[in-house]
Every structure is written in structure tokens, then in C-alpha cells.
A protein has these predicted regions:
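Rossmann-fold cofactor-recognition segment
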Residues: 42-53
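N-terminal Rossmann NAD(P)H-binding glycine-rich loop of SDR-like oxidoreductase domains
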Residues: 4-24
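Conserved Rossmann-fold NAD(P)-dependent oxidoreductase catalytic core, especially the SDR/UDP-sugar
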Residues: 100-147
Length: 324
């Protein structure tokens, strides 16, 4: 039986990844600074620990022989957390420290294969000024100019892991995630992403009411459902391709149209009030030519399919909170 160590197992993607690995027959140790928000972890062992502490990283890697490490732990959140500038130092310090600690202890304990979750936020800001974005191929990451400290740290850590691959022979695989969403993700409190925030606003608002939206709503994104994200991760880890490679949808949608899609699921007719707020770039889409070439696969789910599943889940969360 293969053993996997999942860092960030108390988070959205990490929690789903643990379930996927267990379904494939892995023995899994999950690690996070917090428990999973919505259910107990299904990991064989779940360790509460702060990966900014090197002693914690040494302990979780040193007592067992792991076949694979999945490093998803990071200080992150939605636009309201990443783009205000108020958390820049924490994002840089916390995430960089986690990655420096984990890759060193993985090397010291002889973990042969590592997955690192990077982000589309590494791409240059000037390549994302047009809402009609035609996709961000991996090769345009340099010259580097991410639009946030979150993106800069991700780019640094890509290079960190690849340097350990070159110098120590670790089999490293890196994916650049593009706006992953789905059930069991944060949907309130300021760290939620756009799909969850939109679902919450619509679910909480009475018919004929009004929801608020940052900016003019013409900014565009692609959003990837969690099941397809995990399929991409597992295919990448089973391949001989290191990446970095995009794992994302190429179905571009404006935030205005995303809101209308969610309203359609709800059956409500709501007004949108546009207000000032952090926006990020104007247009971001995944270019999937490389993943198709290297893995013979690309995401295919229509956005509406995943969004309806997510809306129904968040609608249930809102209803349960109102009627405990």
C-alpha cells in the first residue's frame, strides 16, 4: 500500500484530495493548522500542526516512509484577502516558510515524489488586462510580473521545488491551479472565492432583492470544478512530466454572467449593485494545450454543471444556519 502525506488536508482542495487518495487505496496522513471546516478528515491519521515550525515538518516526515508528498498548505484566500495589500507580509512569510521547511524535510527523509500546488496568479499582470483573455500558456510566466504577493511567492516556490529536483533528484510535479471551486469550500468570512461568494449572496437574498458586486462585473475568469482538479493532479503525478502545467478550465465567463447563472439556479430575479472593491486582473483563462499534449487530457465539465452542484450545497448551508 502506498503512503501519501497531504499538507493542507484541512483545506478545501486538500480535504477532497485526501478522499480521492483513500478511494485509490492509499494510506494517508493529513496535516493542517486547523481541522476541516465541514467534516472530520477521512485520512488514516490527521495531525494538527503549524508547518511554519520546522520541528513539526521534521516530525511528520521522519517517522514513516512516504511514497508521495502533496504540498497544498498556504496562507491564502479570495480577492478581499489577497489584493487589499493588508496581508502581503503574512502571505509571503507564511507560505514561503512552509515551502522552505517542507521541501527540506522531504529531502532529508527521502520522500521520492512531491506535488506542489502553484497558481495562475503567477502570470504577468500585463498579460491579463483584456477581459477577452485567450488563455495563459505556461511559457509566458517570464519575464515575471505577478499582480500580487501571493503570486510572487508561488513563483518563488515553483523555482524552489524545481531546484531540489535538479540538485537532489526528487521527482517534482507542479500544477498551476485556475480558480478551483466546489462543495465543502469556504463560503463566507472574507476568504471565500468568487463562485462561493456569489452562491452565498444569491442564497441569502430574498427574491427581487439586491446583491453587491465589486467593480463593473465585466472582469472575466475561468473556474474549475474540484473533481476535475483532482483528476488533473493524479494524472500529473502518474506521468513523467514535471510541469509547471495549467490545471484549469478554458470556459471564460464574466462575473456579471456568473451571477446571472447562479440566479438561474435559484429561480430568483435579483438586482446587481456594483461597488468599489479589490478586483485582481481584468481577464484570466487557462491555456490547456500543454496539459493535452503531455497528459492526453484536459478539463471538460461545463461550468454550469459544477456551479449548480456548488450552489445547491451552499444553499443547504445557508438554510441550515437559519434553521439549526
Amino acid at each position: 500500500m502506498k503512503r501519501a502525506l497531504v499538507c493542507g488536508a484541512g483545506g478545501f482542495i486538500g480535504g477532497h484530495l485526501v478522499k480521492r487518495l483513500k478511494a485509490e487505496g492509499y494510506w494517508v496522513r493529513g496535516v493542517d493548522i486547523k481541522e476541516h471546516e465541514f467534516h472530520p478528515s477521512v485520512a488514516d491519521e490527521f495531525v494538527l500542526g503549524d508547518l511554519r515550525e520546522q520541528s513539526v515538518c521534521r516530525k511528520i516526515t521522519g517517522d514513516l516512509r512516504f511514497d508521495e508528498l502533496y504540498q497544498l498548505a498556504a496562507d491564502m484566500g479570495g480577492a478581499g484577502y489577497i489584493f487589499t495589500g493588508e496581508h502581503d507580509a503574512a502571505v509571503m512569510h507564511n507560505s514561503a516558510t512552509i515551502n522552505l521547511n517542507m521541501v527540506e524535510e522531504a529531502k532529508n527523509s527521502g520522500i521520492p515524489k512531491i506535488f506542489y500546488s502553484s497558481s495562475a496568479c503567477i502570470y504577468p499582470e500585463e498579460a491579463q488586462m483584456d477581459p477577452a483573455n485567450h488563455g495563459l500558456p505556461e511559457k509566458i510566466a517570464y519575464p515575471a510580473h505577478p499582480d500580487s504577493e501571493y503570486g510572487w511567492e508561488k513563483l518563488f516556490s515553483e523555482r524552489l521545488y524545481l531546484s531540489y529536483q535538479r540538485n537532489y533528484g526528487i521527482d517534482v510535479h507542479i500544477a498551476r491551479f485556475h480558480n478551483v471551486f466546489g462543495p465543502e469550500g469556504t463560503w463566507e468570512g472574507g476568504k471565500e472565492k468568487a463562485p462561493a461568494a456569489m452562491c452565498r449572496k444569491v442564497a441569502e437574498t430574498a427574491d427581487s432583492g439586491e446583491i453587491e458586486m465589486w467593480g463593473d462585473g465585466e472582469q472575466t475568469r475561468t473556474f474549475l470544478y474540484i473533481d476535475e482538479c483532482l483528476e488533473g493532479v493524479r494524472r500529473l503525478m502518474e506521468s513523467d512530466f514535471s510541469g509547471p502545467v495549467n490545471i484549469g478550465s478554458d470556459e471564460l465567463i464574466s462575473i456579471n454572467d456568473l451571477a446571472k447563472m447562479v440566479m438561474g439556479f435559484s429561480g430568483k430575479d435579483l438586482r446587481i449593485r456594483h461597488i468599489p472593491g479589490p478586483l485582481g486582473v481584468r481577464g484570466r483563462s487557462s491555456d490547456n494545450k500543454l496539459i493535452q499534449e503531455k497528459l492526453g487530457w484536459r478539463p471538460t465539465w461545463p461550468l454550469s454543471k459544477g456551479m449548480e452542484i456548488t450552489y445547491r450545497w451552499i444553499e443547504d448551508q445557508v438554510r441550515s444556519r437559519r434553521n439549526p
